């Protein structure tokens, strides 16, 4: 038996799997602050505009996350860019938290808040008038901290390895808030109608706001 040859073939297979896994795990931050998952030099770039208070965005993430990343991103032929279209103060607070800390933490922060959206949006719908008043008065940092307290964001971030001072630093990061505002302004400038919305290689996909429709577009182009 040719054990060296068999071992070499097995090693090649393992290296191929590792390479595919590396593309799926690769995350790059663009100059605008958006996050690019996969091969940054991929021939095709899919851009997703996301709002954390958008229920359709949470639905899309549940339906599309695995097939999109494991089928399309893993190959290295397509990269996924996540940009923010901030539509309200809660959305801004969550976006600041998903972007909190090292870039490597973004994707799981992003997924955690989307998967738990029903719980924290449910809390937002049942807060008292006094609590809501804290969200709209005082310095921006104090307003965001009040939201984080009332909606359970400190506990969510603690489970992700952040202590309260680290969360407070991110909620006070006005440079980050400005980058998120710039991404939102860019979305408005190019005519993004709402979230989720998608671009392929910079071209806005009209009428494409769910996984079924997007998947058909991807199959037609790749």
What are these regions (language model features)?
Residues 86-194, 201-203, 208-212, 219-222:
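Cysteine-centric redox/oxidoreductase cores and disulfide-bonded domains
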Residues 50, 200-201:
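A cytosolic small-molecule/anion-sensing beta-strand core signal
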Residues 2-92, 115, 125, 184, ...:
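Extracytoplasmic thiol/disulfide redox context detector
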Residues 43, 194-195:
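A structure-centric signal for secondary-structure junctions around beta-strands
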């Amino acid at each position: 038996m040719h054990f060296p040859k068999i071992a070499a073939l097995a090693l090649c297979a393992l290296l191929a799997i590792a390479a595919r896994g590396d593309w799926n795990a690769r995350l790059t931050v663009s100059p605008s602050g958006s996050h690019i998952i996969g091969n940054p030099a991929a021939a095709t770039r899919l851009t997703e505009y996301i709002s954390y208070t958008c229920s359709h965005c949470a639905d899309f993430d549940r339906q599309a996350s695995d097939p999109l990343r494991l089928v399309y991103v893993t190959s290295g032929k397509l990269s996924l860019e996540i940009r923010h279209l901030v539509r309200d103060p809660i959305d801004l607070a969550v976006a600041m938290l998903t972007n909190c800390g090292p870039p490597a933490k973004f994707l799981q922060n992003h997924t955690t808040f989307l998967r738990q959206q029903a719980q924290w949006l449910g809390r937002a719908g049942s807060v008292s008038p006094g609590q809501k008043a804290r969200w709209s008065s005082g310095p921006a940092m104090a307003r965001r901290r009040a939201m984080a307290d009332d909606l359970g964001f400190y506990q969510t971030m603690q489970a992700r390895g952040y202590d309260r001072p680290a969360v407070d630093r991110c909620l006070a990061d006005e440079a980050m808030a400005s980058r998120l505002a710039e991404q939102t302004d860019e979305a408005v400038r190019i005519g993004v109608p709402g979230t989720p919305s998608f671009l392929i290689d910079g071209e806005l996909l009209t009428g494409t706001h769910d996984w079924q429709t997007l998947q058909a577009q991807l199959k037609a182009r790749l």
